[in-house]
Curated annotation (Swiss-Prot):
PROSITE patterns: SHMT (PS00096). It comes from Onion yellows phytoplasma (strain OY-M). Catalyzes the reversible interconversion of serine and glycine with tetrahydrofolate (THF) serving as the one-carbon carrier. This reaction serves as the major source of one-carbon groups required for the biosynthesis of purines, thymidylate, methionine, and other important biomolecules. Also exhibits THF-independent aldolase activity toward beta-hydroxyamino acids, producing glycine and aldehydes, via a retro-aldol mechanism. It catalyses: (6R)-5,10-methylene-5,6,7,8-tetrahydrofolate + glycine + H2O = (6S)-5,6,7,8-tetrahydrofolate + L-serine. Homodimer. (6S)-5,6,7,8-tetrahydrofolate binds at residues 120, 124-126, 246. Pathway: One-carbon metabolism; tetrahydrofolate interconversion; Amino-acid biosynthesis; glycine biosynthesis; glycine from L-serine: step 1/1. Keywords: Amino-acid biosynthesis, Cytoplasm, One-carbon metabolism, Pyridoxal phosphate, Transferase. One of its GO terms (cellular component) is cytosol. It is found in: Cytoplasm. GO terms for molecular function: glycine hydroxymethyltransferase activity; pyridoxal phosphate binding. Belongs to the SHMT family. This is Serine hydroxymethyltransferase. It comes from the Bacteria.
């Protein structure tokens, strides 16, 4: 093996698949709410020689020598993260959002402690107590629901559930919720039952960083967790923030040696780059456009007779109840059809869904990725029109082929 060979010469099979994925990303309208396009600078950092360095431990407290440079990189990432989110302490080592949540749980809870989060069906996340997740296996998980009529958080009902359950930890933050979260009300509820408050801002981190969504630290959240790769537009990875020194010490132990060994320094460098980018004025303008696009997009569907869960969106995503359009529709059927015309969404449960999680009654739509590409309101209005036409001709392959050409024509304007 010649280590100086590039990927194309060393492994043609993997090189070709990456090239195919590059084409797919250029030739599809990507509406997955949890995806985005990172900058070249983020890619450069993540693909750097930092991947060669093992650095178990924390800056100035490593188990390996030769960490002078990577210590500086991790310190910079921490400094930028705390500045961006207005926090005193940050752990930038979690490999993912799930591991960030796991590390926070390790810090705050003991096995068997009670946790309270939003039902997965209503927009929560697997790591907020689902039985198939560590969070439902190691801890006694309880759930609150959205209001059955408004499909929004019902803080009075959440309070009732909390008073009944008496959880050790309350989780606020979701994977499929399109309205603003009132963290201060969650803080009041948590204080009333003497619980920790953890905010999982994985989806809305970019909005929070720019002041376009309330920050959980304004409500004195005990812990804030996040991913990097959604609205924050960074590499895949996790982040934990807190303002409380004792909690921070426990978090550090919870991550290392609790659930991880050596951190991915190349990813931490990419996180640092993403934090710097998020402090630029242009990033706030981008986030404003993400919200404008999502709002316009959702309204375009409503005007065509689609039911948007909770009536609309305040952030970067929304859910469409496809069964309201046609009882024979399912989220999986619509998502699979849309992929044929180069529009990518994901099937998603909606509140009180009667379908199985791999079938669903809804689809989830997000605007971050295509806003990065350059889409504006009028582009999303056109996409809504194309999606509606395709849905109304679900089984007409010839018609769908025509719609696909219109999708490619739209994308060609942005791929020059």
């Amino acid at each position: 093996m010649n280590q100086k060979l590039g990927l194309k010469d060393q492994d043609q099979e993997i090189f070709d698949l990456i090239e195919q994925e590059k084409i797919r990303q250029k030739e599809n309208i990507l509406l997955i709410a949890s995806e985005n396009f990172v900058s070249q600078a983020v890619l450069d950092a993540q693909g750097s020689i930092l991947t060669n360095k093992y650095a178990e431990g924390y800056p100035q407290a490593r188990y390996y020598n030769g960490c002078k440079n990577v210590d500086q990189i991790e310190k910079i990432a921490i400094q930028r993260a705390t500045k961006l989110f207005g926090a005193k302490y940050a752990n930038v080592q979690p490999h993912s959002g799930s591991q960030a949540n796991m590390g926070a749980f390790q810090a705050l809870l003991k096995p068997g402690d009670k946790i309270l989060g939003l039902s997965l069906m209503d927009g929560g996340h697997l790591t907020h107590g689902h039985k198939l997740s560590f969070s439902g296996g190691f801890y006694e998980a309880h759930f609150y629901n959205v209001h059955p009529q408004t499909e929004m958080l019902d803080y009075d009902e959440i309070r009732k559930v909390a008073l009944k359950v008496k959880p050790k930890l309350i989780i606020a933050g979701y994977s499929a919720y399109s309205k603003t979260i009132n963290f201060k009300k969650f803080r009041q509820i948590a204080d009333e039952v003497n619980a920790y408050l953890m905010a999982d801002i994985a989806h809305i981190a970019g909005l929070v960083a720019c002041g376009l969504h309330p920050c959980p630290f304004e409500a004195n959240a005990d812990v804030v967790t996040s991913t990097m790769h959604k609205t924050l537009r960074g590499p895949r990875g996790g982040l934990i923030l807190t303002n409380k020194e004792e909690v921070f010490k426990k978090i550090n132990r919870g991550i290392f040696p609790g659930i991880q060994g050596g951190p991915c320094i190349h990813t931490i460098a990419a996180k640092a780059v993403a934090f710097q980018e998020a402090m630029m004025p242009s990033f706030k303008e981008y986030q404003k456009q993400v919200i404008k696009n999502a709002n316009t997009f959702a309204k375009a569907f409503q005007q065509k007779g689609y039911r948007i869960v909770s009536g609309g969106t305040d952030n970067h995503l929304f859910l469409i109840d496809v069964k309201h359009k046609n009882p024979e529709f399912t989220g999986s059927k619509i998502a699979n059809m849309l992929e044929k015309i180069n529009i990518v969404v994901n099937k998603n449960t909606i509140p009180f869904d009667q379908e199985k999680p791999f079938v669903t009654s809804g689809i989830r739509i997000g605007t971050p990725a295509m806003t990065t590409v350059g889409f504006r309101e009028n582009d999303f209005i056109l996409v809504a029109d194309l999606m509606d036409k395709a849905i109304n001709h679900l089984d007409d392959e010839s018609y769908l082929a025509q719609i696909k050409q219109q999708v490619l024509a739209l994308l060609s304007k942005f791929n020059k």
